[in-house]
Amino acid sequence: KLGGTTPLEVILKFPNQDKNKSDEDDEFEDWGEGENKDDEKYWFTKDKIDKIDSVHNYLDGLPAVGKVLSFSSIIQVATQLNNNKPLGTLEMGVLYSKIPESIKKEIIDPYISIKDNEARISLRIIDSQDGLRRNDLINKINYDLENKLKLNKEEFKLAGVLILFNNLLQSLFKSQ
């Protein structure tokens, strides 16, 4: 039995943490020029990691979903390498700052955008599954992310070939 998969991506958007600025701080503003690299290692907060992990685990539990990859996958491997002790946010930040750029590009950048304050979860939908209704699956994921995982609509977006294909099919159905 042959069958394929269709990619779907869930983009998680995190609220911007604007630093409280007052007029008094302006005279010292030029001191923080090297701050950007430091800010990167502080991006890895418990809330962000927990949110990525909960969405990853939810998607992984759906019967129509095949492989799920995200920053959570990397954390799972790092935990195994750390004698099954979970990494703390400080350890993740330090590790991130010490990883060579070439490795960051390969294993972290596809799943985390610190600049955009986003995380990407990539998954494959099993097309050969009996009774797969793509539109219903997309609606279920949207509903569950909002109602079961308590994310706001502004905090996530579904994208990828599955969405394009589903939109094409829906347009065809409506034109009949």
Residue ranges and their predicted role:
Residues 1-176:
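Extracytoplasmic
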